[in-house]
A protein has these predicted regions:
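Noncatalytic alpha-helical scaffold of FAD-dependent oxidoreductases
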Residues: 1-174
């Protein structure tokens, strides 16, 4: 989204948006700063920003909330709303990225609700290419995403319902 202000100057490979609510008297900024410091020391993060006010907090959330619209404008080859057990989210991403890395020129957009294991894992044409060039591979792409999700004990269906009944039958023995 061209008019959307990004929180980081240099765009990182991954963003994690954390919104906390704490008991009265506790300082959320201090809690997040402690979290960032520990994560940085452990090599888990390279940068972090704590919202300084509600306007900045809303600005951070706007980046996340505009992702579906940005995806729609670009035009995905194949979009997925899947779930995997929370502890296996990194494994799903590793396996799926490795699988689709063999396909050549594609872009992947993965975002979701990491607190509950729901992911939107979307495949897009490479920059400057048309999604029509990939239409013959759409079923193969969908099958791979669903297979990886199910292999990890997840589902082809997350927050937006059960999806197509045929998939429910295929993976649940309908």
């Amino acid at each position: 989204m061209p008019d959307l202000r990004q929180p980081f100057e240099a765009r990182p490979e991954w963003f994690v948006l954390i919104d906390v609510g704490l008991a009265r008297g506790l300082d959320p900024a201090q809690a997040l700063e402690t979290l960032f410091a520990e994560a940085f020391e452990a090599g888990l993060v390279s940068d972090g920003i704590v919202a300084q006010n509600d306007a900045q907090r809303h600005q951070f959330w706007e980046v996340r909330e505009q992702m579906p619209e940005a995806n729609r404008r670009i035009g995905s080859v194949s979009s997925h709303d899947i779930s995997v057990p929370l502890g296996l989210v990194p494994e799903f991403i590793r396996r799926a990225d490795a699988h689709f890395g063999t396909m050549g020129d594609i872009r992947i957009n993965c975002f979701g609700h990491l607190g509950d294991g729901n992911l939107h894992y979307n495949i897009f044409p490479a920059q400057g290419r048309s999604k029509a060039e990939y239409v013959t591979r759409r079923d193969e792409i969908k099958r791979a995403v669903h297979d990886i999700s199910h292999d990890l004990g997840g589902s082809h269906s997350a927050e937006h319902g059960i999806g197509r009944f045929s998939l429910f039958e295929q993976y649940q023995g309908g």
